[in-house]
């Protein structure tokens, strides 16, 4: 039963492949995202840039806001729960969200355990920085992965680092024999069966999107060319000068990621991009990507 349920959830996430998922904080923003071609929206009270700027404890959004956003659009609605906070996840499932993001953008609720995602009917998306993190999350029941990046910075460097790390590790696996795979599984603290599956198939068992710091159409196309299956855009759209135009442009660039002429065309006259932050200027205790284990 559990296996078939997980397979169904993975199939649901596959339906988002090649698309853009946008962070929204109001029903109006959700409508803009849907009209721009987003395949789903992430309902939030504050985008990551505001969470980063305002500090404090970041928790699950008010269910009333999530329901208002659900009523405003016909595309799937995601919402974030804190790492390890299975009751926030239970609440999100109870109000009918389509996907739950167990997210390092919120303040972690548990410093040892992630949520056991097999206990839920709703598919989960989780962040990863490398293959070990990716496969640990899949073992816990994640139906979809994303790079962690460094959310709320408008700086794509961490998302690139995480995507490259995952795909280079997959390529390494493919040249290993069974003995080496056993040892490697122990080194990256991932279940051997999953490691072996990835080595055999040459790909992750679930879709892997890029997230964290994507601010321009070129950023989105860069990650797609690196091999991700789709794009999450957080603060990059509604913290920019012309959100409607930028949202459409990022969708176009994600669809036509191998066509520089189209990317050039949609990148024209987008107005001011969000103000970015250099990663090395962020104090270590404020780096979101390090949250999770």
Swiss-Prot record:
Oligomeric and partner information: In the presence of PdxT, forms a dodecamer of heterodimers.
Positions that bind D-ribose 5-phosphate: 23, 152, 213, 234-235
Identification of the protein by name: Pyridoxal 5'-phosphate synthase subunit PdxS
Organism of provenance: Chloroflexus aurantiacus (strain ATCC 29366 / DSM 635 / J-10-fl)
Catalytic reactions of this protein: aldehydo-D-ribose 5-phosphate + D-glyceraldehyde 3-phosphate + L-glutamine = pyridoxal 5'-phosphate + L-glutamate + phosphate + 3 H2O + H(+)
GO molecular function: amine-lyase activity; pyridoxal 5'-phosphate synthase (glutamine hydrolysing) activity
Gene3D superfamilies: Aldolase class I (3.20.20.70)
PROSITE patterns xrefs: PDXS_SNZ_1, PDXS_SNZ_2
Entry superkingdom: Bacteria
